Amino acid sequence: MGRKNCAVIMLTSACLVLTACAPTEFPEQNGTEHQNQMEGVAKQELTEFDTDDVEKIPDHLTCQVDDLLMVDADVRLWGLSEWKLSDWYATEKNYTESEEEAHELIQKMMNEAGWKYEEKDVECYRNSEGEKIYYVEISNHEDNVYVLPDRFSYSTERGYVSLNQSDFCGDYKGDNRELYKTGRELAFGSIKESEQLAVDYAEKMGIQVSDTVDCYTLDEKNKRISWLDLDKFDNHTPEEEENRNFSYAIFLYQDYFGIPGLRYDPGDGKLTNDTTFRSSVCEVSVDRDGIAYFQSAPTYELEKMGTEQEILRPADIIEKQVEMMKSKEETGEMNLSEVSLEYLPVYDKETELYHMCPVWACYYSQTVTHYGEVNYDSEEKYIAIYDAYTGEVLQTK
């Protein structure tokens, strides 16, 4: 979905007040009359977020609710074409269940990297749970391919450093990752070309991803944070590493009937009946030499469809989320950054199936002050999950 129209909104404790693209001037009047007029505008303009035409829903909301609460949020509907979605039931793909398929996947990744594949080079071991893991170590410089039960990866030294030993690695799970979403294009290729390269690679590996991706430009701001293994990199200096490691970090989201799986950790394994929640984000590094790093995510395969039902509009969820945030805002400034329609995988141990439930995921953050010998603030990231059919709060974290 491309960028559509925007709306600038103000929120009161009672309702949403919106003006489309330009502020509305209100004459000087007493507080009650002014408030009534603002509420009248809200009832009229809120229809933009409650329309039956999905394509007319704005994809970004900006507002200052009060001194402590800000909404500057992307509204992600992904491939939604109507206000109806079906739940469904799935199994998780096991990439190492078949030795032959694991070898084929390794061969694909090595061919794409320009590395020579030989069956004798593929090694295998079992993890603590007895599951097989297949891999090929090309060198001791983080050049390798791995196939695990729930995912697979291809890594080069340069890609590994960019995504796993850099400032971006420390930032990307928090709101600071937006510092790298500058839109700056690097000399070796445009953002659009690099995004397409990442999508094409995923599809060659058998993963269907959404047309919507997130791209972050890693340039001089992306410093290497770990040089403990410097002995592995002969004749390298931090300055040389910085200059040669300009790249794009691209996040891909697996597509299920037009909607991604839940992309980030909800922070509570009980919600999914799983001991650990695995993000559905595929991470890719693209640099001057092409794909430098690719890590897939758990993939769910359809077993049976559930029942199609109408889902709530974004406006309903935004109102609920703002009220929830207002109840917590006295502890620090808060920002709602994203409202996204996603599938939540809930594992049923009896059937051994995942129930893929459509949910509205609201990603938000709060400035938290830590007191001690030296006081400091940190930006804490949270997620609230709502049943897309009923609006029931499944989790606030």
Where are the regions that the model predicts?
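Short linear motifs in intrinsically disordered/low-complexity regions
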Residues: R3-C6, Q37, A388
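A short, surface-exposed beta-strand/turn
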Residues: V145-C169, G261-F294, H370-K397
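Helix N-cap and loop-to-helix transition residues
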Residues: S190, R313-P314, D387
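Segments that shape or occlude catalytic/ligand-binding pockets
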Residues: L197-E283, D287-Y371
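Sec-dependent N-terminal signal peptides of Gram-positive bacterial secreted proteins and lipoproteins
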Residues: G2-F26
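Preferential activation on post-signal-peptide N-terminal prodomains/segments
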Residues: C21-N273
